[in-house]
From Swiss-Prot:
It comes from Rhodococcus globerulus. It is an enzyme of class 1 (oxidoreductase). Residues 6-125 form the VOC domain. PANTHER family: CATECHOL-2,3-DIOXYGENASE. This is Biphenyl-2,3-diol 1,2-dioxygenase 3. Belongs to the extradiol ring-cleavage dioxygenase family. The gene is bphC3. Its cofactor is Fe(2+). GO terms for molecular function: biphenyl-2,3-diol 1,2-dioxygenase activity; ferrous iron binding. Keywords: Aromatic hydrocarbons catabolism, Dioxygenase, Iron, Metal-binding, Oxidoreductase. Fe cation binds at residues 9, 73, 121. The keyword NAD does not apply. Pathway: Xenobiotic degradation; biphenyl degradation; 2-hydroxy-2,4-pentadienoate and benzoate from biphenyl: step 3/4. One of its GO terms (biological process) is catabolic process.
Length: 190
């Protein structure tokens, strides 16, 4: 059975966070769901965010290269953790490995680079409703670390198949039990 994911959000890196935030508010009629000095999440509907803007502390991003100003990634949401794991295993069997797996807390995410180097995120929402996701984003765990730790996707697949509860596997606490990589370094390099 083929599962078709749905588009979740896109992320843009910018040196002009306030101006970009206002532009998306004006152009899309979006509203701010969460923001801090380095990022802003906006939405136009019931989703916790459709547009994310990231302006690294201190700014100074050079003009567009694969790791600077412009589209950072597109994201697609799968209905269940099992569906995401199945897709991971299908891609792995074809030699397509995630560039970086991240337990954001609000989502469990696998980031891939396409042949041109564009980042594509395959994810599941870790909460049943957008309101729960938004509440989490305003909580201490998320505001302390908005990105989250990496995780080992094969270990996730094995734990899922072994019957470890999904409610445990979709937490940062579980992700931190696996080997860690530098998430931001992996996201910002080709």
């Amino acid at each position: 059975m083929t599962v078709t994911p749905r588009l979740a959000h896109f992320v843009l890196q910018t040196n002009q966070l306030p101006a970009m935030t206002q532009w998306y508010i004006d152009v899309l009629g979006a509203h701010v769901v969460y923001e801090n000095p380095a990022m802003c999440f906006l939405t136009t509907d019931e989703e916790h965010h459709r547009v994310a803007l990231f302006g690294p502390p201190g700014g100074g991003l050079p003009e567009r290269t694969p790791a600077t100003v412009g589209l950072a990634h597109t994201a697609f949401t799968f209905p269940t953790l099992g569906d995401l794991i199945d897709k991971y295993l299908q891609l792995r069997d074809k030699g397509i490995e995630p560039r970086v797996p991240v337990q954001h807390g609000v989502t469990t995410s696998l980031y891939y680079r396409d042949p041109d180097g564009n980042m594509v995120e395959l994810q599941i929402d870790n909460f049943a409703t957008p309101e729960e996701s938004t509440d989490y984003m305003h909580g201490e765990e998320y505001t302390t670390d908005t990105i989250g730790p990496s995780f080992n996707p094969l270990a996730l697949a094995e734990a899922y198949k072994a019957g470890v509860p999904e409610s445990e596997l979709t937490t940062r606490a579980w992700a931190l039990k696996t080997e860690q990589i530098n998430v931001m370094e992996r996201m910002l390099t080709p």
